[in-house]
A protein has these predicted regions:
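Conserved N-terminal segment of class I S-adenosyl-L-methionine
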Residues: 1-82, 90, 116
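Short conserved AdoMet
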Residues: 27, 123, 159
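A conserved beta-strand element that flanks and buttresses the S-adenosyl-L-methionine
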Residues: 88-93, 97
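Short, flexible/disordered intra-domain loops and linkers
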Residues: 98-111, 139-147
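A short glycine-rich, Lys/Arg-flanked "PGG" loop and its adjoining helix->strand segment in the class I
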Residues: 106-127
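Acceptor-substrate binding/catalytic loop of class I
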Residues: 130, 136-156
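Class I S-adenosyl-L-methionine
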Residues: 150-200
Length: 200
């Protein structure tokens, strides 16, 4: 069983707030990939509303979720191009490749590789939702824990992949939803959150 993690709940509440804006529209019978499915359980309530969704989750840790779950490394998955209409990453991309979780191999550019995979796995017209740590003051890696992104780091990763920002929302460290109002820069080793809606 995965230990209780209030950080996962906080990021799930950000997803719920963005979903409530009406910006995240799941097409009928959408094929959905969740990257890092062991903690933030949005699948159960979503499938109660939308039983037509076909959700596949991938995580290093064992996860019992509705839909299909794959225990393993997202970077070794060989999904065909265009396999998914929607990709969801709730507080996951920033951890990939840092070796934080048991048996999680180190890939220095794990987040970059994963974002490139997401761009390939998305079907034309598909969208991806990512919520990640954010600090306008600068990009930073917190040991093996997580990456904190700024606007430059995001642009460097997303622009070459042909992923376009279709929406951006913020939440502060406590999870208070700020909508489209960017938070003030924070000191080093501190962050808020940004949620991105990306399209191809």
């Amino acid at each position: 069983m995965t230990p209780y993690n209030p950080h996962g709940d906080l990021c799930l509440s950000i997803f719920a707030d963005v979903y409530a804006t009406g910006a995240l529209v799941f097409p009928p019978n959408a094929r959905v990939l969740e990257i890092g499915c062991a903690e933030a359980d949005w699948q159960t309530p979503m499938l109660a509303l939308r039983p037509d969704l076909q959700i596949t989750g991938v995580d290093w840790r064992k996860a019992k979720r509705p839909g299909t779950t794959i225990q393993g490394d997202i970077l070794t998955q060989d999904f065909a191009p265009g396999s998914f209409d929607v990709v969801v990453g709730i507080s996951s991309i920033e951890h990939i490749g840092l070796g934080h979780y048991e048996a999680d191999p180190k890939y220095l550019d794990g987040d970059v590789t994963c974002m490139a995979d997401v761009a390939q796995w998305l079907a034309p017209g598909g969208w991806a939702y990512l919520d990640i740590p954010y600090n306008a003051a600068g990009y930073e890696v917190l040991n093996t824990e997580a990456r904190i992104y700024d606007d430059r780091a995001l642009a460097e990763r997303l622009t070459p992949l042909g992923l376009r920002e279709a929406g951006r929302w913020y939440a502060d460290r406590s999870g208070r939803f700020l909508g489209t109002t960017a938070p003030e820069p924070r000191p080093a080793h501190s962050f808020d959150y940004v949620a991105l809606l990306l399209t191809r």
